[in-house]
Amino acid sequence: MNDKVAATLVLVVTYSIVGASLWCLTYAWHDETKLYYWCIVQLLPVMLWVWCVISWCGAQLFGYAKRGKAD
């Protein structure tokens, strides 16, 4: 998969998540009990993205770590 296809795929997935979140908000706008589900729908992709970035940074740090001699 080349870079252009990967970037387009990420963009389409991101906009579909935003569109689904906005549709869910308009569906739950008049019922206050459903707004809790809106918060979950809105925050779950953000937390998954943060978790992925932190995991990737940790993997990069671990991969480039220099191994010292055992004392």
UniProtKB/Swiss-Prot annotation:
**Major subcellular site:** endoplasmic reticulum
Record's subcellular location: Endoplasmic reticulum membrane
Bilayer topology reads: Multi-pass membrane protein
Q: List keywords of the entry alphabetically.
A: Endoplasmic reticulum, GPI-anchor biosynthesis, Membrane, Transmembrane, Transmembrane helix
The signal peptide here is none
UniProt pathway:
Glycolipid biosynthesis; glycosylphosphatidylinositol-anchor biosynthesis
What is one Pfam family matched by this protein? PIG-Y
Ranges annotated as spanning the membrane: 5-25, 35-55
Would you tell me the Gene Ontology cellular component terms? endoplasmic reticulum membrane
Which biological process terms from the Gene Ontology are attached to this UniProt entry? Answer: GPI anchor biosynthetic process
**Subunit structure, interactors included:** Interacts with GPI2, suggesting that it is a component of the GPI-GnT complex, probably composed of GPI1, GPI2, GPI3, GPI15, and ERI1.
According to its UniProt entry, the function of this protein is described as: Probable component of the GPI-GlcNAc transferase (GPI-GnT) complex in the endoplasmic reticulum, a complex that catalyzes transfer of GlcNAc from UDP-GlcNAc to an acceptor phosphatidylinositol, the first step in the production of GPI-anchors for cell surface proteins.
Q: What is this protein called?
A: Phosphatidylinositol N-acetylglucosaminyltransferase ERI1 subunit
